[in-house]
Amino acid sequence: MGCGSRAGKMEQHNAGKPHVAQKHCIGCGQCRKICAHGAPIITDKKCAIDHDKCLGCGRCIAICPKDAIAPDCDEIAEVLNYKIAEYAKAVVDGRPSFHISIVRDISPDCDCHPENDVPMVPDVGMFASFDPVALDLACAEAVNRQPVLPGSRLAETADPEDHDHLHAMHPNTCWRAAVEHGKKIGLGTDDYTVITVK
């Protein structure tokens, strides 16, 4: 999301407003506390989201201790990833660009969330490329090759057979959709070779 302005990031998230699975909601109010817009409303120890106030940022989804809040459907996460690729294309299209990713302190949630946990995997390193799609893919695949750090939230939830750490942490988020869409719109390719410099 680094290529989007603050307003652009809000627009990227705005495709889907969350809903609450009432049977899982315990009425703790964590969602209400984290929402800057007062969208979650607690009535009779159950939450409902006022979609007129909701901007779709997803903070309530991340903080819910019972996973009672979710986007309307899996398609919404895919749309978000498409928008991320489209915003990046709008910024770099027709301009010379070089991209650097520092892959360290890989937290289970977006770093904008104050309730974030310890890193899921060891630090990987720094990656650089003229191709932003290949760079993102190389970074994600490098993260997925790392061992899970004990004591991390991923260690508590990971399936030993699932080596996609990013998917294991957020099953409704299709990070690969951004890569595929980035290729489709001409942002970059999925062709990369890692050259290690020590």
Language-model region placement:
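Extended, low-polarity segments enriched in aliphatic/aromatic residues
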Residues: 1-198
